[in-house]
């Protein structure tokens, strides 16, 4: 089940399905934030796919193609638990599957959940390949440097994220 989330102000970001006219990549989702003053926040406007079939722990590969009008355009991907409980502070928990080979101590400036990539060539389809370890989760999208309370833990066999998550 694909979905669009757009919490930006009207006219800032548009997300729509379009036919590209390209025989190899005939259909695409287009995200246009040319009305924005800066890049779109990770939680404000995105295209996602919800997964409710149930996953098994292991290494998964997410592959897609992206194209941008300008070289250097950032693309981000993460896999998050759909429904979260509130913690003791009254805030919603955030549970993400971890990028494969992430080490919070060795990579203190990197997110363990979010894969960040920059499109190198303008107007050219670029293959993006990301590996996720569904056997581990992190409790925040931020880096350990910006969130010293960042926790990496093994995924429980009956964890809710294995039954209902979405990829962005």
Regions inferred by a protein language model and the residue ranges of each:
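Short beta-strand and strand-turn-strand segments in soluble, beta-rich domains
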Residues: 42-44, 89-116
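Beta-strand-rich interaction surfaces with strong enrichment in secreted/lumenal proteins
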Residues: 47-53, 112-121
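Extracellular beta-strand ligand-recognition surfaces/modules
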Residues: 127-168
């Amino acid at each position: 089940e694909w979905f669009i989330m757009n919490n930006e102000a009207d006219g800032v970001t548009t997300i729509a399905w379009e036919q590209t006219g390209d025989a190899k990549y005939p259909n695409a989702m287009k995200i246009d934030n040319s009305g924005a003053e800066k890049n779109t926040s990770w939680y404000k406007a995105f295209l996602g796919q919800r997964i409710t079939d149930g996953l098994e722990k292991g290494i998964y590969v997410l592959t897609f193609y992206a194209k941008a009008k300008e070289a250097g355009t950032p693309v981000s991907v993460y896999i998050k638990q759909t429904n979260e409980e509130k913690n003791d502070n009254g805030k919603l928990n955030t549970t993400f599957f971890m990028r494969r080979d992430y080490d919070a101590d060795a990579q203190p400036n990197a997110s363990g959940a979010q894969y960040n990539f920059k499109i190198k060539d303008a107007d050219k389809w670029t293959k993006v390949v990301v590996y996720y370890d569904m056997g581990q989760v992190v409790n925040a999208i931020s880096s350990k440097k910006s969130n010293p309370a960042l926790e990496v833990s093994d995924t429980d066999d009956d964890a809710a994220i294995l039954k209902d998550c979405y990829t962005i």
